[in-house]
From Swiss-Prot:
Signal peptide: 1-54
Binding site for Ca(2+) 2: 257, 260, 268, 274, 325
Pfam families tied to this protein: nos_propeller, nos_propeller_2
Assembly: Homodimer.
Ligand binding (Cu cation Z3): 131, 434
Subcellular location: Periplasm
Record-listed Cu cation Z4 binding positions: 495
Organism taxonomic ancestry: Bacteria, Pseudomonadati, Pseudomonadota, Gammaproteobacteria, Pseudomonadales
Regions that span the bilayer: none
A biological process term (GO) from this entry: denitrification pathway
GO cellular component: membrane; periplasmic space
Gene: nosZ
Protein name per its UniProtKB record: Nitrous-oxide reductase
Keyword Cell division: no
Amino acid sequence: MSDKKDQVPGAVEAPRGVSRRSFLGTGAVTGAVLAGATALGAGTFTRESWAAAAKEAKSKIHVGPGELDEYYGFWSGGHQGEVRVLGVPSMRELMRIPVFNVDSATGWGLTNESKRILGDSAKYQNGDCHHPHISMTDGKYDGKYLFINDKANSRVARIRLDIMKCDKILTVPNVQAIHGLRLQKVPYTKYVFANAEFVIPHPNDGHTFDLQDKNSFTMFNAIDAEKMEMAFQVIVDGNLDNSDADYTGKYAASTCYNSEKAYDLGGMMRNERDWVVVFNILRIEAAIKAGKFITLDGSKVPVVDGRKTDGKDSEFTRYIPVPKNPHGLNTSSDGKYFIANGKLSPTVSMIAIDRLDDLFNDRYKDPREVIVAEPELGLGPLHTTFDGRGNAYTTLFIDSQVVKWNMDEAIRAYKGEKVNYIKQKLDVQYQPGHNHASLTETSEADGKWLVVLCKFSKDRFLPTGPLHPENDQLIDISGEEMKLVHDGPAFAEPHDCILARRDQIKTQKIWNRNDPFFADTVALAKKDGINLETDNKVIRDGNKVRVYMTSMAPAYGLTEFTVKQGNEVTVTITNIDQIEDVSHGFVMTNHGASMEISPQQTSSITFTADKAGLHWYYCSWFCHALHMEMVGRMLVEKA
């Protein structure tokens, strides 16, 4: 057996000790402003023009003390498992929303309230979230929910944006690795569309591991956005990568990079073409309503078969051939096109959405007749976003660039007209993946800002050891030229982000006492005869002890309680402060118990008092000048 390392075809190893900047040979500049001058035909900076450009770039992103950003940005946390909230254009981090991870600051994954939301999946303490998206009405953000996928454990979560907390998590049955996630845009977000990436046998019980078996497949998944329950699943040929939906409510589409159903790198690149699969949502709904569906593996979810049979299309899907291994799938903000990004091809494929009716009615001999352009943009196109002025912006992973191109001119060039549809190429640092322009996935794309999420930062920041931050770059696209104005280090590993106007997100200042987030805890207290806003009592129920207390900075309602060694202890605290931003905390030392209690919130946590002796609890939040004195004692008597 050879001891030679496996090599990716075409890959080149960087010499050890050589910086990324030198190896890539991008000629990247040290200042963000200079990078903004890489437009085609841009001139050389003079000392004066350098100073002017630097001043302009700084003013673009400066948000002064006490001033507010124009946009909310929602970033996926990747394999860290959370969602991050940033202000744009300042790129200041405002909040982290734990979802699939355990968070000791807020107690997410530790409190009883969060465990109820996590459900059976609470056993997983990891997640891999990629694609955050906000619910819509009539193609515009309504600010109600944000949805996020978990590729690691095949889940989809919903975040209530009024409280910036996750309120529902669904494990998608019959599939593995929920990756691409998008929402129905029109008439409203009725469905969350979620792609399962990996092909698996059905049933997946070890009876076979043959991916070529007819019962080995993956599925396109639709989730009822309000109920957070499965609506339907569609069996497909090949696998599924990224997806998007149209502006009519009729169609969704997904890329496929493994039409071969292979399990190795070489096999996945064997076919010269893969495809975009388009789903006819109305036909799927009609079939399910008529009872024309099956169920799988003991699940009750309606399943329809969207695979071809003997070369004949299913009524639910159409497969449009595109160059091999496409990645991103993006709907233009004018609602005209699905853009499939080539990845291994230097092209993107523009699919005319207004031709899809004819495609489903079998009026084309070749499904590629719905493709109206296939512009060549550069090496490694991954994702495309839009400015609402007819221009598209595509990340080029291999070239470490973003390319601005005009969609109408690309169509004219495809028809044979000599026109230069590429408007500018801008170096970014380095290897960009997702990108997102302000409001671009809605009908209100305003063409002001572009965020490019670069997978490598290398020499852009102070060194942090072998693990480097990512680099989220902010680009001004309000004028004719793209201008890089900010580098933002990010912990591993954001994949995508979205930008919404600040007026589209309405948040609560303090909790409503009737909030469903802790309604179950309120109901349990009621059974114990407890008024959570006034009572400070201990309820003993066999081996279980329920401790109820209020908190008002800087004191807990109970400063001492006694239990027996081995008791299961549930501490329930209600913050009766009514002042905005006066959050309290509760930590029981040496018991792994920690949680947040914000104004008017009730939180509870359960642990075992397994160590006899005195154990202090304290407020972990700096809620008052005397917060150090906000303490109490648990006295654990020997069993």
